[in-house]
Amino acid sequence: MSLADELLADLEEAAEEEEENLIDEDDLETIEEVQEEMQVDLNAESVKSIAKLSDSKLFSEILLKIDGYIKKQPKASEVMGPVEAAPEYKVIVDANNLTVEIENELNIIHKFIRDKYSKRFPELESLVPNALDYIRTVKELGNNLDKCKNNENLQQILTNATIMVVSVTASTTQGQQLTDEELERIEEACDMALELNQSKHRIYEYVESRMSFIAPNLSIIVGASTAAKIMGIAGGLTNLSKMPACNVMLLGAQRKTLSGFSSTSVLPHTGYIYHSDIVQSLPPDLHRKAARLVSAKCTLAARVDSFHESSEGKVGYDLKEEIERKFDKWQEPPPVKQVKPLPAPLDGQRKKRGGRRYRKMKERLGLTEIRKQANRMSFAEIEEDAYQEDLGFSLGHLGKSGSGRIRQAQVNEATKARISKTLQRTLQKQSVVYGGKSTIRDRSSGTASSVAFTPLQGLEIVNPQAAEKKVAEANQKYFSSMAEFLKVKSEKSGTMTQ
C-alpha cells in the first residue's frame, strides 16, 4: 500500500468517526429503552398459564406460511420491483421477530422448571447452567435420579465429566420425591420448551434459505439472521439502502437496564451489527472499529440488493473478503524493531614512529625466548600438567623434560640491562684499584667454607681469607706508605745511597 492509499484510508476512518459522533437527537430516539423484568408466577399450576406463545394465533399462522413457502420454493427471478412488495418478505420479517419472542418464552419456561424441580434435585441448577441442557436433563431423569449412571441418552446431552459430577451429587442430595401431578407438570413444560426450540430452528433455516435470494449480498456479510433483523427494523431493504452507515450501525440498539440495577455497564450505540458473529469474533478492543467497517459494507451490499444486482452474491463475497483482509491487518503483530549495529569508531590517524631508536626499543620490550617457549605448544602431545596437579598457567615447551643437561642461558644484547658509560668507567676503575672487590661482593667464591675435612686431623677449621691476609702482609713491606728507603751499596762507587 502506497503512502497516498494509507492517507486516504485514515481520512475515511476519521470521517466515519465524525459521522458516528454527530448523531442527531432524532436518531437517538430510535434507540429503544427496554427494562427487563422477568415476572414469573411461581404458584402457577400449569406452564400454559405463563407461556402462551405456542398457543397463539400469530405463532401458528407464521409456521403455516413458512411451510407453504418451503414447498413452493420461489425463484429470485420472480421478484420484480422492490423487495418489500413481495409477500414472502413480510413473512421473513415476522418470522425473524418471532425468534426473539421464542427466546424469551424459553427463558420463562426454564425458570418455571427450575423452581419446580428444585424440590427433587436443587443442586442440578448449578451443575448444568445451560437452559436447554437443563431442560433435557430434567426430562431424562424425572423422579429417578439413579438414571444418571450408565445412561446413553444422557451422554448425548452432557459431557462425561458433568455426568460424573451429577451422579455423585445425586447420591447425596437432600431433595424430596415429586408427586405424580408435579412430575406431570414438569414434563409438560419440558415438552413445550423442546417444541419451541424445534420451531426456532425451523424458522432459522427458512430465513437463511430465503434471505439468499432477497438480499444475497447482505446475508453473505453479516449472516441471514442479522440481515433479516436490520431489514425488519429499517422498514425494508429499500429504506436500508438509503440509510447512512452511521445509522445502520445503530439499528437494534437497546438500553437494556434491569430494574434496580446500574446502567453503567450498558454499551451505547451497539446494535445488531455489533453483536453479529463477524464482529464478535475479534478481540474486544476492535469491536467498535469492526462494527463501523461492517456497517459501511452492509450499506453498499444493501444498495446492490435493492436493485436486484449480483444475485449470485459476488459483490457480497468481495466485500466480505475485503473486511477479513482488514481484520487480519488490524491483528498483525507490530513489526520487529530493527537492531542497528554500532557505528565504526572514528579513530584518528595514529602516529607511527620509526627509526633506529624505535626499533631497538621494540626489540628490548618484545617477547623473550623463554616467553616464546612458554607460549608454544606441540600438536597431539599431552602436556605434563594436563591433570592440573600444579596451579598456574601451562609452561608449554618450557616445561617439557629434556636431556637433563643444563643449557646456559643465552644473553640477548637487545634485552640486557643498560648502564651508562660513566658508570662503566667507575666500575672498571674500582676493579683495577680494589682488585675487583666492592662493598657488595668480591672475587672469592661464594661456596668457600671455613670448615674443611683433612685426612690427618679430620675436621679442621680453615679461614678462607687467611691466604689473602698473608699476601697482604708480605706486600705491605714494599708497597706500604709508611715504608722507608733501604741502603743499597753501589758497585761502581761503593758508596751507600739512601
UniProtKB/Swiss-Prot annotation:
One of its GO terms (molecular function) is U4atac snRNA binding. A motif (Nuclear localization signal (NLS)) lies at residues 350-363. It comes from the Eukaryota. One of its GO terms (biological process) is spliceosomal tri-snRNP complex assembly. Its main location: nucleus. Keywords: Coiled coil, mRNA processing, mRNA splicing, Nucleus, Ribonucleoprotein, RNA-binding, Spliceosome. One of its GO terms (cellular component) is nucleus. The record marks 288 as: Interaction with U4atac snRNA. The record marks 269, 292, 297 as: Interaction with U4 snRNA and U4atac snRNA. Interacts with the snRNP via the Nop domain. The coiled coil domain is formed by two non-contiguous helices. This is U4/U6 small nuclear ribonucleoprotein Prp31. The lineage of its organism: Eukaryota, Metazoa, Chordata, Craniata, Vertebrata.
